A protein has these predicted regions:
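Phosphate-handling catalytic cores of nucleic-acid transaction enzymes
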Residues: 1-559
Length: 559
């Protein structure tokens, strides 16, 4: 994806490396990468789940310190809304505890301090009530005696005493578990206005009764003011608050919510603000091993504590992007705009696509703040932005798969790939046969014999086709002139994935990637997934070997 966006650009800035599942790596010696690697290795959890927990902790620590100015000049908060969908047994709580240790400890200290302060406030308030009664009796006595001067003085004493009423102590608590949006807003108002909703079972947020209150969470994500009108208690306005959501939920909770209220939640824009990950399952694939000293955990949480306890001014620091990062940001923006057009990946997901680059910018700002060595460094570099763009694009893929209906272009491309594979398998041969070859010359879907392959690798089937042939006998939704644009878009996507190549008036299709050098513009399984075809990570590039008649190109791994 980065290669496609940067095509024909003059700079040669490094791109983040990817793991086997297509998730990006940050800088090798960064606190983030070290802690994520240690957590994934020691707890035997997926890297993507470890990254989501780490980013939740980082956003919680940074949201009160910095905002980010996007290249358009628009200033936005750095709060994040993160959702990890994982089954029971995937060690969600263990992973959360690893990255949120410092946050939990600071929150516990704040809670204990507040309890002691509340106890003292109750004593002070009771003494205040006693003194108030004494002053009121003195006032009544003066008023009864008709001493105007004494009455006025007693009244002033009562008024001054009322103004000095001991108020409830504002708590430093900022970490909240499963609760409703209404209660959350109230606690942010009564406590410090920077908080994190952390839960491994987000049932309250994804319950039907909370749906009418989700607009409050939208407003907090936007950085706006939340107005709360109440009859039984004083109304209030929550201003300049920041809230990060680091939620984990089981698939059945999300599926139930989506089936009952998903369309409404999409309509409010609530789901579009989330970065979503459904980690690969690790339960049943773990080995017995003893935990190490977890030294990376200590370094990570020490940095989190530094950020949360640092002196902050009333004005948040505003981060900006470097010039190269700005150029890359605008190219990402153009890519998203193009994909929101008809037949684009995000044509039916404009709500989600419109938030992707802002989420990328927020993520880049928090990563920069967490890793920087000097607080005066306010410029986000292009590598950090590229890492965050790769991460949010992977999250986008998970959003499409688990919180949204499949885009039309993905459905069409799967249908076309299925159709072509069916033809190719029907015509497939493993060695040249003159008689068969003669008969196949009259077949419109021609296929070449497969060459010799290295062990444990296959090239897959291939065939050729023309537009008119697919329009006549292909999938019904891609037939005819009326559906030409949909067919062209599906072919274009297969071309970018490397499975289709134009050869004059015909197109060549192969089950494996057709390229003999380099990588495709898009990698199957990264950002988008065409389930009919092997994933990019399920293929291997083979160098030419004349002694064994191997030709350079991609082969499918035999699992």
């Amino acid at each position: 994806m980065i290669e496609e966006i940067e095509k024909n650009q003059p700079w040669t800035s490094p791109n983040p490396s990817m793991d086997e599942q297509g998730w990006p790596h940050f800088s090798e010696h960064s606190l983030f990468e070290a802690a994520v690697g240690e957590s994934a290795r020691e707890h035997q959890v997926s890297r993507e789940m470890a990254m989501m927990c780490a980013l939740g902790a980082i956003a919680t620590a940074c949201q009160g310190l910095v905002d980010v100015e996007m290249p358009t000049g628009h200033r936005v908060p750095t709060s994040l809304m993160l959702l990890t969908i994982a089954e029971s047994g995937e060690r969600k709580t263990v992973t959360q505890n690893y990255f949120f240790e410092a946050i939990t400890n600071l929150n516990d200290v704040a809670h204990r301090t507040n309890e002691a302060a509340l106890l003292q406030q109750k004593v002070d308030h009771q003494l205040w009530i006693t003194q108030k009664k004494h002053l009121e009796r003195a006032f009544n006595k003066c008023a009864t005696q008709g001493d105007e001067a004494a009455t006025h003085a007693a009244l002033e004493a009562v008024a001054e005493h009322l103004r000095a009423e001991p108020q409830p102590v504002r708590s430093g608590k900022f970490l909240y578990e499963d609760t409703t949006p209404q209660a959350l807003v109230h606690m942010l108002y009564e406590n410090i206005p920077h908080g994190c909703l952390l839960t491994s079972e987000a049932s309250s947020i994804f319950s039907g009764k909370a749906l009418g209150e989700l607009d409050k969470l939208n407003t907090l994500w936007d950085g706006g003011s939340v107005k709360v009108d109440r009859i039984s208690r004083d109304s209030f306005v929550l201003q300049n608050a920041r809230l990060t959501l680091s939620l984990m939920a089981q698939p059945n909770v999300i599926n139930r919510f989506m089936s009952k209220r998903g369309e409404e939640a999409r309509g409010t824009g609530f789901l579009a603000r989330f970065l979503v990950v459904k980690p690969r399952t690790m339960a049943g694939h773990r080995t017995n091993q003893k935990l190490s000293k977890l030294s990376r955990k200590k370094a990570f949480n020490t940095r989190i504590q530094e950020l949360l306890t640092s002196e902050s001014s009333s004005e948040r620091q505003v981060l900006q992007f470097s010039e190269q990062a700005k150029d890359f940001w605008f190219m990402c923006n153009q890519y998203l705009e193009k994909q929101m057009q008809e037949n684009g990946l995000y044509y039916y997901l404009k709500d989600h696509a419109s938030k992707l680059l802002e989420n990328t910018s927020r993520l880049a700002a928090t990563m920069h703040t967490f890793e920087r060595k000097n607080n005066s460094d306010i410029e986000i570099d292009i590598f950090t932005l590229k890492f965050c763009w790769s991460f949010t694009q992977n999250c986008s893929k998970h959003f499409i798969e688990h919180l949204a209906n499949e885009p039309q272009i993905i459905t069409d491309t799967n249908l076309l790939a299925h159709f072509l594979l069916k033809i190719a398998y029907k015509l497939d041969i493993h060695s040249p046969d003159p008689e068969t070859e003669t008969n196949r010359k009259s077949d419109p879907f021609r296929i070449k014999a497969r060459p010799v392959q290295p062990g444990d690798l296959i090239i897959g089937v291939e065939t050729t086709f023309t537009l008119s042939q697919v329009k006549q006998s292909g999938p019904s939704v891609l037939r005819g002139r009326a559906n030409s644009e949909r067919l062209y878009s599906a072919i274009d996507l297969l071309t970018k994935l490397g499975h289709v190549k134009r050869e004059r008036s015909r197109f060549r299709f192969r089950e494996s990637i057709l390229l003999s050098t380099g990588e495709p513009e898009l990698k199957n399984g990264q950002i988008i997934t065409i389930k009919e075809l092997p994933l990019f990570c399920e293929q291997e590039f083979v160098q030419e070997n004349n002694s064994n008649c191997y030709t350079s190109g991609y082969r499918i791994k035999i699992i």
